[in-house]
């Protein structure tokens, strides 16, 4: 067995393989592999990162890797895993998303990026029906879970056709780009096998087209990985700060962290086992979570940004916020729960309730009496203490700290 496949299995990444013998042959003959990415947003997120890492793993084994951006399929929307019709993207937005995602894929995977719109821009509807539609039987499509699961609630002809488009993509890549392997999440099995069937119908049984699916990355509660309470953690630091990504990863549960180390990092499996052993001996040190956060943040944003996120975290949880420089302060406050005020002063007890730091006056008094509340790093015990705009940082921000680790941002209205 190819060492790469052994590694993928050891990490429990592989969900299914269409034909393992064809996969071995494709790897032996130096055929390429591709993964499709949906341009539904203008940045990829941590949920996509497992497939980015898959391409990196293949590339490290000197296998040609390709990333396909759905310039055509993105106009329709993949029905896989959806219970209702997706909203269609405006063409201008779609083109913007494609440009941004193409840049990210080239940066993170060093793969050739292909836009599948190029396959269809000169094809008429009649061409598609004649050259693609005739290859696949309706009954074949109705047996697909992505189709059958939507029959009761309804599926448009647009989304019904998506399976054929993704399948035709594989045929074009197989014929023209020496690509024999398609990979995707486990929800892509139906689309991948349709592509293999289209190749078989077009080129005969001697083809070596094959597919492999990767286990979906879910947490111990069965929820898809990659979203915080505020939403997706994006790879674009203008949409999600490096600090937010670091915090999201460092706060993963003990139940999830070993899987995440295997799925999202290039750390050797034996080394991951050693990390987990050390972690289990003293879970409070969060050795595994620290290894995960460092590996992913350095890979996505670089060592310097990782060190900056680490410093912000250390200051917020162990030190004085005044230790942050201006850039670090601006990054930190973007991630904090925020309350806006259009007055010049407010009693601390009222502010604690207004900002949802406390649930009642009684709880607020408890926080104050036990010394749990700091305003701009000054401890406050008096419930009548006035928090004033004139004392705010740059007369714009006040930072409320509750306990050791909970920060809240107060934004004063500018005159």
Swiss-Prot record:
Tell me the InterPro entries matching this sequence. aa-tRNA-synth_I_CS (IPR001412), aa-tRNA-synth_Ic (IPR002305), Rossmann-like_a/b/a_fold (IPR014729), S4_RNA-bd_sf (IPR036986), SYY-like_C (IPR054608), Tyr-tRNA-ligase (IPR002307), Tyr-tRNA-ligase_bac-type (IPR024088), Tyr-tRNA-ligase_bac_1 (IPR024107)
Q: Where is the S4 RNA-binding domain?
A: 346-413
Q: What class of enzyme is it?
A: ligase
Where would I look for the motif 'HIGH' region in this sequence? 39-48
- A Pfam family of this chain: SYY_C-terminal
Which positions are annotated as binding L-tyrosine?
A: 34, 162, 166
Q: Does the keyword NADP apply?
A: no
Residues reported to bind ATP: 227
Gene Ontology biological-process entries: tyrosyl-tRNA aminoacylation
Task: Tell me which UniProt keywords the record has, alphabetically.
Answer: Aminoacyl-tRNA synthetase, ATP-binding, Cytoplasm, Ligase, Nucleotide-binding, Protein biosynthesis, RNA-binding
Q: Name one GO molecular function term.
A: RNA binding
Q: Where along the sequence does the record place the motif called 'KMSKS' region? A: 224-228
Q: Does the keyword Cell membrane apply?
A: no
Location of the protein in the cell? Cytoplasm
EC numbers for this chain: 6.1.1.1
State the source organism's domain of life. Bacteria
Task: Name a single GO cellular component.
Answer: cytosol
The record's similarity note reads:
Belongs to the class-I aminoacyl-tRNA synthetase family. TyrS type 1 subfamily.
Tell me how this protein assembles. Homodimer.
Q: What does this protein do?
A: Catalyzes the attachment of tyrosine to tRNA(Tyr) in a two-step reaction: tyrosine is first activated by ATP to form Tyr-AMP and then transferred to the acceptor end of tRNA(Tyr).
This chain belongs to the protein called: Tyrosine--tRNA ligase
Q: Which organism is it from?
A: Ureaplasma urealyticum serovar 10 (strain ATCC 33699 / Western)
* Gene coding for it: tyrS
């Amino acid at each position: 067995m190819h060492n790469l496949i052994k590694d993928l299995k050891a990490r429990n990444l592989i969900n299914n393989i269409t034909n393992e013998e064809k996969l071995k042959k494709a790897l032996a003959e130096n055929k390429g592999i591709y993964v499709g990415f949906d341009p539904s947003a203008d940045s990829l997120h941590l949920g996509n990162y497992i497939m980015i890492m898959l391409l990196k793993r293949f590339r490290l084994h000197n296998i040609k890797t390709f990333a396909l951006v759905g310039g055509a399929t993105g106009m329709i929307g993949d029905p896989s895993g959806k219970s209702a019709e997706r909203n269609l993207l405006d063409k201008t937005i779609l083109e913007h998303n494609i440009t941004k995602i193409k840049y990210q894929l080239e940066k993170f995977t060093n793969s050739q990026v292909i836009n599948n719109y190029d396959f269809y821009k000169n094809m008429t509807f009649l061409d598609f029906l004649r050259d693609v539609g005739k290859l696949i039987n309706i009954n074949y499509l109705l047996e697909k879970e992505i189709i059958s699961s939507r029959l009761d609630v309804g599926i448009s002809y647009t989304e019904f056709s998506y399976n054929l488009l993704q399948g035709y993509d594989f045929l074009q890549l197989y014929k023209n780009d020496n690509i024999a392997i398609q990979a995707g999440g486990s929800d892509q099995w139906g689309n991948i096998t349709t592509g293999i069937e289209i190749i078989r119908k077009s080129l005969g049984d001697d083809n070596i087209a094959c597919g492999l699916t990767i286990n979906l990355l879910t947490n111990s509660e069965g929820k898809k990985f990659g979203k915080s309470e505020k939403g997706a953690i994006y790879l674009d630091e203008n949409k999600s700060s490096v600090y937010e990504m670091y915090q999201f990863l460092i706060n993963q549960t003990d139940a999830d962290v070993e899987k995440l180390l295997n799925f999202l990092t290039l750390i050797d499996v034996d080394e991951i086992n050693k990390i987990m052993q050390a972690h289990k001996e003293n879970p409070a040190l969060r050795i595994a979570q620290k290894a995960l956060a460092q590996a992913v943040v350095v890979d996505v944003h670089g060592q310097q940004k990782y060190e900056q996120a680490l410093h912000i975290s250390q200051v917020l949880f162990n030190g004085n916020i005044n230790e942050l420089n201006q850039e670090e302060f601006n990054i930190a406050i973007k991630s904090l729960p925020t309350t806006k005020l259009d007055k010049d002063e407010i009693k601390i007890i009222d502010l604690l309730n207004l900002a949802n730091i406390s649930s009642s006056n009684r709880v607020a008094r408890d926080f104050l009496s036990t010394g749990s509340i700091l305003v701009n790093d000054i401890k406050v015990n008096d419930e009548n203490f006035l928090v004033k705009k004139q004392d705010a940082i740059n007369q714009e921000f006040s930072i409320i700290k509750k306990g050791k680790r909970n920060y809240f941002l107060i934004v004063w209205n500018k005159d």
